[in-house]
Amino acid sequence: MSSQVAGLLQLTALIAALALAYRPLGDYMARVYSSEKHYRPEKWMYKAIGANPAAEMRWPAYLRGVLAFSAMSVLFLYLMQRVQGSLPGSLGFSSIDPDQAFNTAASFVANTNWQSYYGEQAMGHVVQTGGLAVQNFLSAAVGMAVAVALVRGFARSRTGELGNFWADLVRGTVRILVPISVIGAIVLVAAGAIQNFSGIHQVGQFAGGTQEWNGGAVASQEAIKELGTNGGGYFNANSAHPFENPNPLSNLFEVFLILLIPFALTRTFGRMAGSLKQGYAILGAMAVIWIGFTALMMWTEFAHRGPAFEIAGGAMEGKEARFGIAGSSIFAVATTLTSTGAVNSFHSSYTGFGGGITLLGMQLGEIAPGGVGSGLYGMLIMAIIAVFIAGLMVGRTPEYLGKKIGTRQIKFAACYILITPALVLGFTAVAMALPTPADSMTNSGAHGFSEILYAYTSGANNNGSAFAGLNADTQWFNTTIGIAMLLGRFLPMVFVLALAGSLAEQQPVPETAGTLRTDKPLYSGLLVGTILIITGLTYFPALALGPLAEGLAS
Protein backbone atom coordinates (compact mmCIF):
# COMPACT_ATOMS: atom_id res chain seq x y z
CA MET A 1 0.00 0.00 0.00
CA SER A 2 1.42 3.40 -0.95
CA SER A 3 1.82 6.19 1.60
CA GLN A 4 -0.73 8.28 -0.27
CA VAL A 5 -3.39 5.56 -0.10
CA ALA A 6 -2.64 5.01 3.60
CA GLY A 7 -3.08 8.73 4.19
CA LEU A 8 -6.41 8.73 2.37
CA LEU A 9 -7.60 5.80 4.50
CA GLN A 10 -6.57 7.61 7.68
CA LEU A 11 -8.49 10.71 6.62
CA THR A 12 -11.55 8.62 5.73
CA ALA A 13 -11.49 6.85 9.10
CA LEU A 14 -11.17 10.20 10.87
CA ILE A 15 -14.14 11.69 9.03
CA ALA A 16 -16.23 8.59 9.80
CA ALA A 17 -15.40 8.77 13.52
CA LEU A 18 -16.25 12.47 13.67
CA ALA A 19 -19.53 11.84 11.83
CA LEU A 20 -20.51 9.13 14.31
CA ALA A 21 -19.84 11.40 17.30
CA TYR A 22 -21.33 14.56 15.79
CA ARG A 23 -25.01 14.09 16.57
CA PRO A 24 -24.90 12.54 20.07
CA LEU A 25 -22.21 14.89 21.38
CA GLY A 26 -23.75 17.99 19.82
CA ASP A 27 -27.18 17.20 21.25
CA TYR A 28 -25.67 16.34 24.63
CA MET A 29 -23.86 19.68 24.86
CA ALA A 30 -27.08 21.50 23.96
CA ARG A 31 -28.82 19.72 26.84
CA VAL A 32 -25.96 20.56 29.21
CA TYR A 33 -26.14 24.28 28.51
CA SER A 34 -29.95 24.36 28.49
CA SER A 35 -30.47 22.36 31.67
CA GLU A 36 -31.79 24.01 34.82
CA LYS A 37 -30.65 21.13 37.02
CA HIS A 38 -27.50 21.47 39.13
CA TYR A 39 -25.66 18.37 40.32
CA ARG A 40 -24.45 18.19 43.90
CA PRO A 41 -20.71 18.60 43.09
CA GLU A 42 -21.62 21.63 41.00
CA LYS A 43 -23.54 23.14 43.90
CA TRP A 44 -20.47 22.73 46.10
CA MET A 45 -18.42 24.63 43.54
CA TYR A 46 -20.97 27.43 43.30
CA LYS A 47 -21.01 27.73 47.07
CA ALA A 48 -17.21 27.80 47.23
CA ILE A 49 -16.96 30.72 44.80
CA GLY A 50 -20.09 32.48 46.07
CA ALA A 51 -21.98 32.30 42.77
CA ASN A 52 -25.72 32.04 42.19
CA PRO A 53 -26.09 29.81 39.10
CA ALA A 54 -29.74 30.74 38.64
CA ALA A 55 -29.03 34.46 38.24
CA GLU A 56 -29.14 35.57 34.60
CA MET A 57 -26.45 37.99 33.40
CA ARG A 58 -26.47 40.74 30.82
CA TRP A 59 -23.40 40.93 28.62
CA PRO A 60 -21.37 43.39 30.78
CA ALA A 61 -21.82 41.15 33.84
CA TYR A 62 -20.99 38.04 31.80
CA LEU A 63 -17.85 39.75 30.51
CA ARG A 64 -16.81 40.81 34.00
CA GLY A 65 -17.07 37.18 35.09
CA VAL A 66 -14.89 36.03 32.17
CA LEU A 67 -12.24 38.68 32.76
CA ALA A 68 -12.18 38.38 36.56
CA PHE A 69 -11.88 34.60 36.48
CA SER A 70 -9.17 34.71 33.82
CA ALA A 71 -7.20 37.41 35.64
CA MET A 72 -7.21 35.36 38.84
CA SER A 73 -6.14 32.30 36.84
CA VAL A 74 -3.16 34.19 35.37
CA LEU A 75 -2.13 35.39 38.83
CA PHE A 76 -2.48 31.94 40.39
CA LEU A 77 -0.48 30.20 37.67
CA TYR A 78 2.19 32.91 37.71
CA LEU A 79 2.67 32.63 41.47
CA MET A 80 2.74 28.83 41.31
CA GLN A 81 5.65 28.99 38.87
CA ARG A 82 7.48 31.64 40.87
CA VAL A 83 7.48 29.45 44.01
CA GLN A 84 8.01 26.12 42.24
CA GLY A 85 11.37 25.59 43.94
CA SER A 86 9.60 25.42 47.31
CA LEU A 87 6.81 23.08 46.21
CA PRO A 88 6.84 19.31 46.69
CA GLY A 89 7.20 17.26 43.54
CA SER A 90 9.28 19.93 41.83
CA LEU A 91 11.85 17.27 40.77
CA GLY A 92 14.60 19.64 41.86
CA PHE A 93 13.68 22.30 39.31
CA SER A 94 14.10 25.92 40.38
CA SER A 95 11.45 28.63 40.24
CA ILE A 96 10.65 30.14 36.85
CA ASP A 97 11.98 33.58 35.89
CA PRO A 98 9.40 36.43 35.97
CA ASP A 99 9.17 37.01 32.20
CA GLN A 100 8.93 33.27 31.50
CA ALA A 101 6.34 32.79 34.26
CA PHE A 102 4.22 35.64 32.86
CA ASN A 103 4.44 34.25 29.33
CA THR A 104 3.45 30.74 30.44
CA ALA A 105 0.60 31.95 32.68
CA ALA A 106 -0.81 34.14 29.91
CA SER A 107 -0.35 31.31 27.42
CA PHE A 108 -2.25 28.61 29.30
CA VAL A 109 -5.05 30.87 30.55
CA ALA A 110 -5.56 32.24 27.02
CA ASN A 111 -5.85 28.67 25.66
CA THR A 112 -2.71 29.28 23.60
CA ASN A 113 -0.16 27.05 25.35
CA TRP A 114 2.80 28.70 23.67
CA GLN A 115 5.89 27.20 25.28
CA SER A 116 9.31 28.87 25.18
CA TYR A 117 10.68 26.43 27.77
CA TYR A 118 11.55 22.73 27.86
CA GLY A 119 8.73 21.09 29.80
CA GLU A 120 10.75 18.10 30.99
CA GLN A 121 13.58 20.38 32.16
CA ALA A 122 11.62 23.20 33.79
CA MET A 123 8.27 22.12 35.26
CA GLY A 124 7.74 19.67 38.12
CA HIS A 125 4.74 17.45 38.75
CA VAL A 126 2.80 19.99 40.84
CA VAL A 127 3.03 22.81 38.30
CA GLN A 128 2.38 20.47 35.36
CA THR A 129 -0.63 18.73 36.91
CA GLY A 130 -1.99 21.26 39.42
CA GLY A 131 -1.33 24.33 37.31
CA LEU A 132 -0.99 23.77 33.59
CA ALA A 133 -3.36 20.79 33.26
CA VAL A 134 -6.04 22.54 35.34
CA GLN A 135 -5.89 25.56 33.03
CA ASN A 136 -6.27 23.24 30.06
CA PHE A 137 -9.75 22.43 31.38
CA LEU A 138 -10.70 25.92 32.52
CA SER A 139 -9.53 27.90 29.49
CA ALA A 140 -11.44 25.54 27.20
CA ALA A 141 -14.56 25.87 29.36
CA VAL A 142 -14.31 29.68 29.18
CA GLY A 143 -14.24 29.57 25.37
CA MET A 144 -17.24 27.26 25.26
CA ALA A 145 -19.15 29.51 27.66
CA VAL A 146 -18.62 32.59 25.47
CA ALA A 147 -19.71 30.66 22.37
CA VAL A 148 -22.88 29.49 24.11
CA ALA A 149 -23.60 33.07 25.22
CA LEU A 150 -23.49 34.18 21.57
CA VAL A 151 -25.78 31.33 20.55
CA ARG A 152 -28.25 32.43 23.24
CA GLY A 153 -28.06 35.94 21.76
CA PHE A 154 -29.42 34.55 18.50
CA ALA A 155 -31.94 32.25 20.19
CA ARG A 156 -33.42 34.73 22.68
CA SER A 157 -35.47 37.85 22.00
CA ARG A 158 -36.46 41.03 23.83
CA THR A 159 -34.04 40.38 26.66
CA GLY A 160 -30.42 41.25 27.30
CA GLU A 161 -29.77 38.16 29.40
CA LEU A 162 -27.22 35.64 28.13
CA GLY A 163 -27.19 33.05 30.91
CA ASN A 164 -24.82 32.70 33.85
CA PHE A 165 -21.07 32.57 33.23
CA TRP A 166 -20.30 30.57 36.38
CA ALA A 167 -22.92 27.94 35.59
CA ASP A 168 -21.67 27.64 31.99
CA LEU A 169 -18.06 27.39 33.18
CA VAL A 170 -18.75 24.67 35.74
CA ARG A 171 -21.08 22.64 33.50
CA GLY A 172 -18.70 22.74 30.57
CA THR A 173 -15.89 21.48 32.79
CA VAL A 174 -17.73 18.90 34.89
CA ARG A 175 -20.21 17.49 32.38
CA ILE A 176 -18.29 17.70 29.09
CA LEU A 177 -14.53 18.11 29.36
CA VAL A 178 -13.77 15.91 32.37
CA PRO A 179 -15.76 12.80 31.30
CA ILE A 180 -14.42 12.80 27.74
CA SER A 181 -10.88 13.44 28.98
CA VAL A 182 -11.05 10.47 31.32
CA ILE A 183 -12.05 8.21 28.44
CA GLY A 184 -9.38 9.78 26.23
CA ALA A 185 -6.66 9.24 28.84
CA ILE A 186 -7.60 5.56 29.20
CA VAL A 187 -7.37 5.10 25.42
CA LEU A 188 -3.97 6.81 25.32
CA VAL A 189 -2.62 4.67 28.17
CA ALA A 190 -3.81 1.58 26.31
CA ALA A 191 -2.00 2.88 23.22
CA GLY A 192 1.25 3.27 25.16
CA ALA A 193 1.32 6.80 26.62
CA ILE A 194 2.74 6.98 30.14
CA GLN A 195 0.82 7.91 33.30
CA ASN A 196 2.78 8.06 36.56
CA PHE A 197 4.46 10.38 39.02
CA SER A 198 7.95 8.92 38.87
CA GLY A 199 11.03 11.09 39.03
CA ILE A 200 13.98 11.52 36.71
CA HIS A 201 15.65 8.33 35.46
CA GLN A 202 19.15 7.86 34.08
CA VAL A 203 18.79 5.65 31.00
CA GLY A 204 21.65 4.11 29.02
CA GLN A 205 21.87 4.74 25.29
CA PHE A 206 22.79 2.31 22.53
CA ALA A 207 25.58 4.58 21.34
CA GLY A 208 27.00 4.96 24.85
CA GLY A 209 26.42 7.50 27.59
CA THR A 210 23.20 8.19 29.48
CA GLN A 211 20.07 10.24 29.04
CA GLU A 212 17.61 11.65 31.60
CA TRP A 213 13.97 10.67 31.20
CA ASN A 214 11.08 12.13 33.18
CA GLY A 215 7.90 10.39 34.22
CA GLY A 216 4.63 12.22 34.66
CA ALA A 217 0.85 12.21 34.36
CA VAL A 218 1.23 12.48 30.61
CA ALA A 219 -1.79 10.59 29.24
CA SER A 220 -4.30 12.56 31.33
CA GLN A 221 -2.73 15.87 30.32
CA GLU A 222 -2.45 14.77 26.69
CA ALA A 223 -6.17 14.00 26.54
CA ILE A 224 -7.33 17.44 27.68
CA LYS A 225 -4.49 19.09 25.77
CA GLU A 226 -6.06 17.87 22.53
CA LEU A 227 -9.73 17.82 23.55
CA GLY A 228 -9.61 21.40 24.84
CA THR A 229 -7.57 22.55 21.80
CA ASN A 230 -4.85 23.67 24.20
CA GLY A 231 -1.72 22.09 22.75
CA GLY A 232 0.94 22.52 25.44
CA GLY A 233 3.11 19.42 25.64
CA TYR A 234 4.45 17.68 28.72
CA PHE A 235 7.70 17.32 26.79
CA ASN A 236 9.43 19.81 24.53
CA ALA A 237 8.93 17.53 21.52
CA ASN A 238 5.18 17.71 22.20
CA SER A 239 3.16 15.06 20.38
CA ALA A 240 6.24 13.91 18.48
CA HIS A 241 7.48 12.40 21.78
CA PRO A 242 6.71 8.67 22.08
CA PHE A 243 5.61 9.11 25.71
CA GLU A 244 2.83 11.46 24.53
CA ASN A 245 1.98 9.97 21.14
CA PRO A 246 3.42 6.46 20.77
CA ASN A 247 2.11 5.19 17.43
CA PRO A 248 -0.09 5.93 14.39
CA LEU A 249 -3.24 4.79 16.23
CA SER A 250 -2.69 7.23 19.09
CA ASN A 251 -1.83 9.90 16.52
CA LEU A 252 -5.16 9.52 14.71
CA PHE A 253 -7.01 9.40 18.03
CA GLU A 254 -5.40 12.66 19.11
CA VAL A 255 -6.49 14.35 15.88
CA PHE A 256 -9.99 13.02 16.57
CA LEU A 257 -9.92 14.63 20.04
CA ILE A 258 -8.74 17.93 18.54
CA LEU A 259 -11.64 18.15 16.09
CA LEU A 260 -14.35 16.49 18.19
CA ILE A 261 -15.88 19.39 20.14
CA PRO A 262 -15.34 22.20 17.59
CA PHE A 263 -17.26 20.30 14.90
CA ALA A 264 -19.94 19.04 17.32
CA LEU A 265 -20.60 22.57 18.58
CA THR A 266 -22.20 23.38 15.22
CA ARG A 267 -24.87 20.79 16.08
CA THR A 268 -25.22 22.40 19.51
CA PHE A 269 -25.66 25.77 17.80
CA GLY A 270 -28.35 24.44 15.48
CA ARG A 271 -30.18 22.71 18.31
CA MET A 272 -30.15 25.75 20.63
CA ALA A 273 -30.99 28.19 17.83
CA GLY A 274 -33.97 26.07 16.79
CA SER A 275 -32.73 25.20 13.29
CA LEU A 276 -30.45 22.23 12.73
CA LYS A 277 -30.03 23.28 9.09
CA GLN A 278 -28.28 26.45 10.24
CA GLY A 279 -25.80 24.29 12.11
CA TYR A 280 -25.28 22.12 9.03
CA ALA A 281 -24.52 25.22 6.93
CA ILE A 282 -21.80 26.29 9.37
CA LEU A 283 -20.52 22.71 9.53
CA GLY A 284 -20.34 22.55 5.75
CA ALA A 285 -18.22 25.69 5.52
CA MET A 286 -15.86 24.40 8.22
CA ALA A 287 -15.56 20.97 6.60
CA VAL A 288 -14.82 22.33 3.12
CA ILE A 289 -11.92 24.43 4.43
CA TRP A 290 -10.53 21.65 6.65
CA ILE A 291 -10.64 18.94 3.98
CA GLY A 292 -9.29 21.33 1.35
CA PHE A 293 -6.36 22.39 3.51
CA THR A 294 -5.59 18.78 4.45
CA ALA A 295 -5.56 17.66 0.82
CA LEU A 296 -3.38 20.61 -0.19
CA MET A 297 -0.91 19.93 2.64
CA MET A 298 -0.59 16.25 1.77
CA TRP A 299 -0.06 17.06 -1.91
CA THR A 300 2.59 19.67 -1.05
CA GLU A 301 4.54 17.38 1.27
CA PHE A 302 4.28 14.29 -0.95
CA ALA A 303 5.48 16.15 -4.06
CA HIS A 304 8.84 14.75 -5.18
CA ARG A 305 11.71 16.90 -6.38
CA GLY A 306 14.98 15.09 -6.79
CA PRO A 307 16.31 11.67 -5.72
CA ALA A 308 16.43 12.45 -1.98
CA PHE A 309 12.68 13.10 -1.84
CA GLU A 310 11.97 10.03 -3.95
CA ILE A 311 13.95 7.79 -1.60
CA ALA A 312 12.25 9.27 1.47
CA GLY A 313 8.80 9.17 -0.13
CA GLY A 314 8.35 12.92 0.21
CA ALA A 315 9.53 15.78 2.41
CA MET A 316 10.40 13.80 5.55
CA GLU A 317 12.64 16.37 7.25
CA GLY A 318 11.28 17.21 10.70
CA LYS A 319 8.73 14.38 10.62
CA GLU A 320 8.57 11.18 12.67
CA ALA A 321 8.99 8.00 10.62
CA ARG A 322 6.25 6.28 12.65
CA PHE A 323 3.69 8.86 11.46
CA GLY A 324 5.00 9.56 7.99
CA ILE A 325 3.94 12.41 5.76
CA ALA A 326 0.22 11.58 5.87
CA GLY A 327 -0.05 11.37 9.66
CA SER A 328 2.07 14.49 10.07
CA SER A 329 0.12 16.49 7.48
CA ILE A 330 -3.30 15.56 8.90
CA PHE A 331 -2.10 16.51 12.38
CA ALA A 332 -0.48 19.78 11.23
CA VAL A 333 -3.63 21.01 9.48
CA ALA A 334 -5.90 20.00 12.38
CA THR A 335 -3.70 21.72 14.93
CA THR A 336 -3.40 25.01 13.01
CA LEU A 337 -7.01 25.23 11.80
CA THR A 338 -7.97 24.90 15.47
CA SER A 339 -6.37 26.75 18.38
CA THR A 340 -4.54 23.61 19.50
CA GLY A 341 -0.96 24.22 18.43
CA ALA A 342 0.23 20.75 19.42
CA VAL A 343 2.74 19.33 16.96
CA ASN A 344 3.86 15.84 15.98
CA SER A 345 6.35 17.24 13.47
CA PHE A 346 8.31 20.47 13.14
CA HIS A 347 6.47 23.00 11.00
CA SER A 348 9.65 24.96 10.35
CA SER A 349 10.98 21.96 8.40
CA TYR A 350 7.96 21.70 6.10
CA THR A 351 8.28 22.79 2.50
CA GLY A 352 7.86 26.51 1.88
CA PHE A 353 4.26 26.07 0.77
CA GLY A 354 3.58 23.55 3.56
CA GLY A 355 4.70 26.04 6.18
CA GLY A 356 2.54 28.65 4.48
CA ILE A 357 -0.52 26.40 4.81
CA THR A 358 0.00 26.14 8.57
CA LEU A 359 0.36 29.94 8.74
CA LEU A 360 -2.73 30.58 6.63
CA GLY A 361 -4.74 28.12 8.70
CA MET A 362 -4.15 30.23 11.78
CA GLN A 363 -4.66 33.51 9.92
CA LEU A 364 -8.14 32.45 8.82
CA GLY A 365 -8.96 33.02 12.49
CA GLU A 366 -8.86 29.32 13.36
CA ILE A 367 -12.51 28.89 12.49
CA ALA A 368 -12.47 25.68 10.46
CA PRO A 369 -13.41 24.21 12.85
CA GLY A 370 -11.43 26.46 15.19
CA GLY A 371 -10.81 26.21 18.90
CA VAL A 372 -13.21 24.86 21.50
CA GLY A 373 -15.82 27.61 21.62
CA SER A 374 -13.70 30.21 19.86
CA GLY A 375 -14.08 28.39 16.54
CA LEU A 376 -17.87 28.61 16.68
CA TYR A 377 -18.12 32.24 17.72
CA GLY A 378 -15.43 33.19 15.19
CA MET A 379 -17.33 31.45 12.39
CA LEU A 380 -20.60 33.08 13.46
CA ILE A 381 -18.91 36.48 13.26
CA MET A 382 -17.84 35.65 9.70
CA ALA A 383 -21.39 34.45 8.99
CA ILE A 384 -22.66 37.89 9.96
CA ILE A 385 -20.09 39.56 7.69
CA ALA A 386 -21.16 37.28 4.81
CA VAL A 387 -24.83 38.13 5.37
CA PHE A 388 -23.99 41.83 5.44
CA ILE A 389 -22.10 41.60 2.14
CA ALA A 390 -24.99 39.70 0.55
CA GLY A 391 -27.40 42.33 1.82
CA LEU A 392 -25.35 45.10 0.23
CA MET A 393 -25.43 43.29 -3.11
CA VAL A 394 -29.23 43.03 -3.20
CA GLY A 395 -30.04 46.26 -1.38
CA ARG A 396 -31.75 44.72 1.65
CA THR A 397 -31.17 45.08 5.37
CA PRO A 398 -29.25 41.91 6.24
CA GLU A 399 -30.75 39.38 8.62
CA TYR A 400 -29.35 36.28 10.27
CA LEU A 401 -31.49 33.80 12.20
CA GLY A 402 -34.30 36.34 12.26
CA LYS A 403 -32.15 39.11 13.75
CA LYS A 404 -31.41 42.33 11.87
CA ILE A 405 -27.73 42.98 11.28
CA GLY A 406 -27.55 46.73 11.61
CA THR A 407 -24.82 49.31 12.11
CA ARG A 408 -24.21 48.35 15.72
CA GLN A 409 -23.83 44.64 15.00
CA ILE A 410 -21.50 45.24 12.04
CA LYS A 411 -19.29 47.52 14.13
CA PHE A 412 -18.89 44.77 16.72
CA ALA A 413 -18.12 42.20 14.00
CA ALA A 414 -15.67 44.53 12.25
CA CYS A 415 -13.80 45.24 15.48
CA TYR A 416 -13.59 41.50 16.11
CA ILE A 417 -11.97 40.70 12.75
CA LEU A 418 -9.54 43.66 12.97
CA ILE A 419 -8.02 42.90 16.37
CA THR A 420 -5.95 39.83 15.55
CA PRO A 421 -4.45 41.08 12.26
CA ALA A 422 -3.48 44.35 13.96
CA LEU A 423 -1.67 42.43 16.70
CA VAL A 424 0.03 40.01 14.29
CA LEU A 425 1.21 42.53 11.72
CA GLY A 426 2.00 45.26 14.25
CA PHE A 427 4.19 43.11 16.49
CA THR A 428 5.85 41.46 13.47
CA ALA A 429 6.74 44.84 11.97
CA VAL A 430 8.21 46.11 15.25
CA ALA A 431 10.18 42.90 15.81
CA MET A 432 11.66 43.07 12.31
CA ALA A 433 12.52 46.76 12.68
CA LEU A 434 14.40 46.38 15.96
CA PRO A 435 17.84 44.76 16.05
CA THR A 436 17.47 42.64 19.20
CA PRO A 437 14.43 40.44 18.24
CA ALA A 438 15.99 39.65 14.86
CA ASP A 439 19.00 38.16 16.66
CA SER A 440 16.74 35.29 17.79
CA MET A 441 16.23 34.08 14.21
CA THR A 442 18.18 30.96 13.31
CA ASN A 443 17.56 31.56 9.61
CA SER A 444 17.77 34.68 7.50
CA GLY A 445 15.78 35.75 4.48
CA ALA A 446 12.22 34.63 3.77
CA HIS A 447 12.31 31.73 6.24
CA GLY A 448 13.60 33.96 9.04
CA PHE A 449 10.76 36.41 8.41
CA SER A 450 8.32 33.48 8.46
CA GLU A 451 9.62 32.49 11.91
CA ILE A 452 8.75 35.92 13.34
CA LEU A 453 5.42 36.11 11.51
CA TYR A 454 4.52 32.59 12.65
CA ALA A 455 5.32 33.40 16.30
CA TYR A 456 2.99 36.39 16.50
CA THR A 457 0.33 34.72 14.34
CA SER A 458 0.39 31.76 16.71
CA GLY A 459 0.28 33.92 19.83
CA ALA A 460 -2.42 36.37 18.78
CA ASN A 461 -4.62 33.58 17.37
CA ASN A 462 -4.18 31.55 20.58
CA ASN A 463 -2.63 28.63 18.73
CA GLY A 464 0.73 28.08 20.42
CA SER A 465 2.65 26.16 17.76
CA ALA A 466 5.96 27.55 16.53
CA PHE A 467 8.57 27.53 13.82
CA ALA A 468 11.25 25.89 15.95
CA GLY A 469 14.05 27.93 14.38
CA LEU A 470 13.16 30.96 16.51
CA ASN A 471 14.70 31.35 19.97
CA ALA A 472 11.63 32.71 21.74
CA ASP A 473 12.94 32.45 25.31
CA THR A 474 14.00 36.10 25.53
CA GLN A 475 12.53 38.99 27.50
CA TRP A 476 11.29 40.60 24.28
CA PHE A 477 9.43 37.59 22.95
CA ASN A 478 8.21 36.36 26.34
CA THR A 479 6.69 39.78 27.03
CA THR A 480 5.34 40.76 23.61
CA ILE A 481 3.96 37.34 22.73
CA GLY A 482 2.41 37.19 26.22
CA ILE A 483 0.67 40.52 25.58
CA ALA A 484 -0.43 39.36 22.12
CA MET A 485 -1.91 36.17 23.61
CA LEU A 486 -3.95 38.02 26.25
CA LEU A 487 -5.20 40.73 23.89
CA GLY A 488 -5.86 38.21 21.12
CA ARG A 489 -7.95 36.08 23.47
CA PHE A 490 -9.96 38.55 25.54
CA LEU A 491 -10.46 41.64 23.34
CA PRO A 492 -12.43 39.59 20.76
CA MET A 493 -14.55 38.19 23.59
CA VAL A 494 -15.58 41.75 24.50
CA PHE A 495 -17.09 42.27 21.05
CA VAL A 496 -18.57 38.77 20.89
CA LEU A 497 -20.47 39.30 24.13
CA ALA A 498 -21.49 42.85 23.18
CA LEU A 499 -22.83 41.46 19.90
CA ALA A 500 -24.67 38.71 21.76
CA GLY A 501 -26.30 41.26 24.05
CA SER A 502 -27.44 43.43 21.14
CA LEU A 503 -28.93 40.42 19.34
CA ALA A 504 -30.74 39.14 22.42
CA GLU A 505 -32.49 42.50 22.82
CA GLN A 506 -34.03 42.34 19.34
CA GLN A 507 -37.42 41.06 18.36
CA PRO A 508 -37.20 38.40 15.64
CA VAL A 509 -38.00 39.56 12.12
CA PRO A 510 -40.37 37.30 10.16
CA GLU A 511 -38.88 35.62 7.11
CA THR A 512 -40.03 36.96 3.73
CA ALA A 513 -39.51 35.99 0.10
CA GLY A 514 -36.51 38.33 -0.06
CA THR A 515 -34.76 36.92 2.99
CA LEU A 516 -31.39 35.32 2.26
CA ARG A 517 -31.57 31.61 3.04
CA THR A 518 -28.63 30.95 5.34
CA ASP A 519 -29.31 27.23 5.68
CA LYS A 520 -28.42 26.31 2.09
CA PRO A 521 -25.18 25.16 0.42
CA LEU A 522 -25.11 28.41 -1.59
CA TYR A 523 -24.72 30.39 1.61
CA SER A 524 -22.02 28.02 2.88
CA GLY A 525 -20.12 28.73 -0.34
CA LEU A 526 -20.56 32.47 0.17
CA LEU A 527 -19.27 32.10 3.72
CA VAL A 528 -16.16 30.20 2.60
CA GLY A 529 -15.49 32.80 -0.10
CA THR A 530 -15.87 35.66 2.37
CA ILE A 531 -13.41 34.06 4.77
CA LEU A 532 -10.78 33.42 2.10
CA ILE A 533 -11.09 36.88 0.52
CA ILE A 534 -10.87 38.78 3.82
CA THR A 535 -7.91 36.70 4.98
CA GLY A 536 -6.17 37.03 1.63
CA LEU A 537 -6.54 40.80 1.52
CA THR A 538 -5.28 41.07 5.09
CA TYR A 539 -2.27 38.79 5.08
CA PHE A 540 -1.17 38.31 1.45
CA PRO A 541 1.61 40.94 1.54
CA ALA A 542 3.15 39.34 4.63
CA LEU A 543 2.77 35.82 3.23
CA ALA A 544 4.39 36.96 -0.01
CA LEU A 545 7.49 38.06 1.91
CA GLY A 546 7.71 34.78 3.83
CA PRO A 547 6.41 31.33 2.85
CA LEU A 548 5.37 32.21 -0.71
CA ALA A 549 8.79 33.66 -1.51
CA GLU A 550 10.48 30.64 0.05
CA GLY A 551 8.25 28.18 -1.78
CA LEU A 552 8.78 29.83 -5.18
CA ALA A 553 12.53 30.02 -4.60
CA SER A 554 12.74 26.28 -3.92
From Swiss-Prot:
<keyword id="KW-0630">Potassium</keyword>
<feature type="transmembrane region" description="Helical">
    <location>
        <begin position="375"/>
        <end position="395"/>
    </location>
</feature>
<feature type="transmembrane region" description="Helical">
    <location>
        <begin position="352"/>
        <end position="372"/>
    </location>
</feature>
<dbReference type="InterPro" id="IPR004623">
    <property type="entry name" value="KdpA"/>
</dbReference>
<feature type="transmembrane region" description="Helical">
    <location>
        <begin position="1"/>
        <end position="21"/>
    </location>
</feature>
<feature type="transmembrane region" description="Helical">
    <location>
        <begin position="412"/>
        <end position="432"/>
    </location>
</feature>
<keyword id="KW-1133">Transmembrane helix</keyword>
<feature type="transmembrane region" description="Helical">
    <location>
        <begin position="323"/>
        <end position="343"/>
    </location>
</feature>
<dbReference type="GO" id="GO:0005886">
    <property type="term" value="C:plasma membrane"/>
</dbReference>
<keyword id="KW-0472">Membrane</keyword>
<comment type="subunit">
    <text>The system is composed of three essential subunits: KdpA, KdpB and KdpC.</text>
</comment>
<feature type="transmembrane region" description="Helical">
    <location>
        <begin position="59"/>
        <end position="79"/>
    </location>
</feature>
<dbReference type="GO" id="GO:0008556">
    <property type="term" value="F:P-type potassium transmembrane transporter activity"/>
</dbReference>
<feature type="transmembrane region" description="Helical">
    <location>
        <begin position="525"/>
        <end position="545"/>
    </location>
</feature>
<feature type="transmembrane region" description="Helical">
    <location>
        <begin position="174"/>
        <end position="194"/>
    </location>
</feature>
<keyword id="KW-0813">Transport</keyword>
<feature type="transmembrane region" description="Helical">
    <location>
        <begin position="246"/>
        <end position="266"/>
    </location>
</feature>
<comment type="similarity">
    <text>Belongs to the KdpA family.</text>
</comment>
<feature type="transmembrane region" description="Helical">
    <location>
        <begin position="279"/>
        <end position="299"/>
    </location>
</feature>
<feature type="transmembrane region" description="Helical">
    <location>
        <begin position="131"/>
        <end position="151"/>
    </location>
</feature>
<feature type="transmembrane region" description="Helical">
    <location>
        <begin position="481"/>
        <end position="501"/>
    </location>
</feature>
<dbReference type="GO" id="GO:0030955">
    <property type="term" value="F:potassium ion binding"/>
</dbReference>
<keyword id="KW-0633">Potassium transport</keyword>
<keyword id="KW-0812">Transmembrane</keyword>
<dbReference type="Pfam" id="PF03814">
    <property type="entry name" value="KdpA"/>
</dbReference>
<comment type="function">
    <text>Part of the high-affinity ATP-driven potassium transport (or Kdp) system, which catalyzes the hydrolysis of ATP coupled with the electrogenic transport of potassium into the cytoplasm. This subunit binds the extracellular potassium ions and delivers the ions to the membrane domain of KdpB through an intramembrane tunnel.</text>
</comment>
<keyword id="KW-1003">Cell membrane</keyword>
<keyword id="KW-0406">Ion transport</keyword>
<protein>
    <recommendedName>
        <fullName>Potassium-transporting ATPase potassium-binding subunit</fullName>
    </recommendedName>
</protein>
